[in-house]
């Protein structure tokens, strides 16, 4: 597969690669990801037991979610297109004495292999790739029958724009400026339609709410900004 055929945005890839050395700093530029990670794990564990399950973490970055999944008994493979992030993930997992299979790999290459997974996570990635529907389709091709896929992304509406771009990037400086592109945000109806076209069935959609006074995230019935979705392949 040539670089022009890959489902990656080179500017997005470079932007997150530049954050690699700060990835595991809970007070650094990736602080929101550190705050949201326990909420992602909580949601996944509400839907399925992790112990002994083979998990593919797509767009694993520096390994925040991959490590959390491994510590809860999952057998984890983490893939990302950023070599610098995969290096950070490998080094940190080694320090923690965790056995995680990290690969700097395009997910489409994995679809040609025989291995299929019980669980696939694709968190905060869809809004950063040129073709999110293609990403969902490839995830669907890698799940076992009856397995569960988890996506998290950002709704596309005025409130989401105010919260995630104006608020998070410019007012509270929770994220580096330019982290998000509003045009790439995804409505739940769009995510569901793309997933169903790939043979998936929606099980649940749950919102993620930020409490500024507590400086923490939690699950919510409000999906107007950040949200998580769980699908299955039957």
Swiss-Prot record:
EC id: 2.1.1.222, 2.1.1.64
Keyword Transferase assigned: yes
GO biological process, one term: methylation
CDD domains named in the record: AdoMet_MTases
Annotated keywords: Methyltransferase, S-adenosyl-L-methionine, Transferase, Ubiquinone biosynthesis
SUPFAM superfamilies linked: S-adenosyl-L-methionine-dependent methyltransferases
Keyword Disulfide bond belongs to the record: no
Record: residues binding S-adenosyl-L-methionine: 40, 59, 80, 123
Top-level enzyme category: transferase
Coiled coil, from the record: none
Catalyzed reactions: a 3-demethylubiquinol + S-adenosyl-L-methionine = a ubiquinol + S-adenosyl-L-homocysteine + H(+); a 3-(all-trans-polyprenyl)benzene-1,2-diol + S-adenosyl-L-methionine = a 2-methoxy-6-(all-trans-polyprenyl)phenol + S-adenosyl-L-homocysteine + H(+)
Family: Belongs to the methyltransferase superfamily. UbiG/COQ3 family.
Summary of the function given for this chain in its UniProt record: O-methyltransferase that catalyzes the 2 O-methylation steps in the ubiquinone biosynthetic pathway.
UniProt-recorded name of the protein: Ubiquinone biosynthesis O-methyltransferase
Organism for this UniProt entry: Coxiella burnetii (strain CbuK_Q154)
């Amino acid at each position: 597969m040539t670089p022009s055929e890959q489902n990656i945005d080179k500017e997005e890839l470079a932007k997150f690669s530049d954050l690699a050395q700060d990835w595991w700093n809970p007070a650094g530029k990736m602080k929101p990801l550190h705050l949201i990670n326990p909420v992602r794990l909580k949601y996944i564990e509400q839907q399925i037991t992790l112990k002994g399950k083979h998990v593919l973490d797509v767009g694993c970055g520096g390994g925040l979610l991959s490590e959390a999944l491994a510590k809860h008994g999952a057998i984890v493979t983490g893939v990302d297109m950023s070599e610098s992030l995969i290096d950070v993930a490998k080094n940190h997992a080694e320090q923690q004495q965790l056995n995680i299979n990290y690969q700097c790999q395009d997910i489409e290459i994995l679809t040609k292999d025989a291995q299929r997974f019980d669980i696939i996570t694709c968190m905060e990635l869809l809004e950063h790739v040129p073709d999110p529907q293609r990403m969902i389709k490839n995830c669907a091709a890698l799940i076992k029958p009856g397995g569960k896929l988890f996506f998290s992304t950002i709704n596309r509406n005025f409130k989401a724009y105010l919260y995630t771009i104006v608020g998070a990037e410019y007012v509270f400086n929770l994220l580096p400026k330019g982290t998000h592109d509003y045009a790439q945000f995804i409505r739940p109806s769009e995510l569901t339609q793309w997933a169903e076209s790939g043979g998936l069935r929606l099980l649940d959609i749950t919102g993620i709410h930020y409490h500024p006074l507590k400086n923490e995230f939690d699950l919510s019935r409000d999906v107007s900004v950040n949200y998580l979705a769980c699908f299955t392949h039957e």
